[in-house]
Design a protein with these regions (language model features):
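Active-site loop-to-helix "anion-binding N-cap" substructures in soluble metabolic enzymes
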Residues: 1-230, 234-301
Length: 301
């Protein structure tokens, strides 16, 4: 552990702060976190936080969710412009237009979305909870926003529902094609292909396992000397290579990188602790609507 990491660990106790980090964050940032997880795990951990402050090492929608679930706490996002391109593909007005078009449908909103979009949805979901959330709803028609790839995957798992898709996606996952999957299998024929459902349908169909980042990690950890092609952001590849030195871990693409997730540096976390970052603030009405959607997700899951 370096000097900067030691300083952060001392200060977070002094300032009564909980540090959370997503699996896609740089490893040195993960190392100073109190908890590392996928979007669902981080939302649950934020909800149960006892500390007066939360530093969310991730992207903006994650920090917004932490604030929504903890309106009385101070929440920081270390890098203000760490956004999510998928979240930017849809607005609250887009959701309201879909509601008007499909008045009998429930709106399921992937957590990779803004607080404003969550506020006009019925319930949120993560990649690990999406199927359970969709099954929990009495409506036959489900508007699934914004990720068309996750929505298409869930439509296959729950064929009794009519899933209405929105044309949004994660550009990092959507850039991976069936040709990439075939090439990776040819290069590593002994390896199992583990992919995230934000990937295109042609990639998910080619996989041995489809699941959340936590699910991918758990699957690989169960075979510590196995061979795996990792079909999600390379932060997961980095974690597995460090944790499982006897395993053979290959990225599905070498450039499978979310630039926004990699923006966070240790110095940014320190700036939060030393008061040089502006906390997350959201309109009260937006927070109230979004909180209902997030809390329903957590209750169902």
């Amino acid at each position: 552990m370096n000097e900067l990491q030691s300083k952060i660990l001392a200060l977070k106790k002094e300032r009564d702060c909980l540090i959370l980090a997503h699996y896609y964050q740089p490893l040195d940032v993960q190392d100073i976190a109190d908890a590392v997880g996928d979007s669902f795990a981080l939302a649950k951990r934020a909800q149960s936080a006892s500390q007066s402050g939360i530093i969310m090492c991730g992207v903006r929608f994650m920090a917004e969710s932490a604030k929504i679930l903890n309106p009385g706490k101070t929440v920081w996002l270390p890098v203000a412009d760490a956004g999510c391109p998928m979240a930017d593909t849809i607005t609250a007005d887009d959701v309201l237009a879909l509601r008007k078009q499909y008045p009998e449908a429930a709106v399921v909103c992937y957590v990779n979305s803004t607080a404003a979009v969550k506020a006009v949805s019925d319930i949120c979901c993560t990649s690990s909870s999406a199927e359970k959330v969709v099954r929990s709803l009495p409506n036959r028609q489900i508007i699934f926003v914004p990720d068309k790839n996750l929505g298409a995957y869930i439509a296959k798992q729950v064929p009794e529902k009519e899933i209405i898709l929105y044309n949004g996606c994660c550009p990092i996952h959507d850039a991976v094609t069936g040709e990439h999957a075939a090439a990776a299998r040819q290069a590593h024929p002994e390896a199992r292909l583990l992919v995230h459902p934000e990937c295109r349908e042609e990639v998910s169909d080619a996989a041995d396992y489809v699941g959340s980042t936590a699910g991918i990690l758990d699957t690989a950890r169960r075979t510590p000397e196995g061979s795996f092609i990792i079909g999600t952001e390379n932060g997961v590849t980095d974690i597995l290579r460090r944790e499982l030195p006897q395993a053979h871990i290959f990225p599905l693409r070498e450039d499978f990188v979310c630039a926004d997730m990699k923006k966070t540096k240790l110095a940014d976390v320190l700036d939060c602790l030393e008061g040089r970052r502006t906390p997350i603030e959201l309109p009260q009405k937006e927070m109230d609507g979004a909180r209902a959607s997030l809390e329903r997700m957590i209750a169902v899951s």
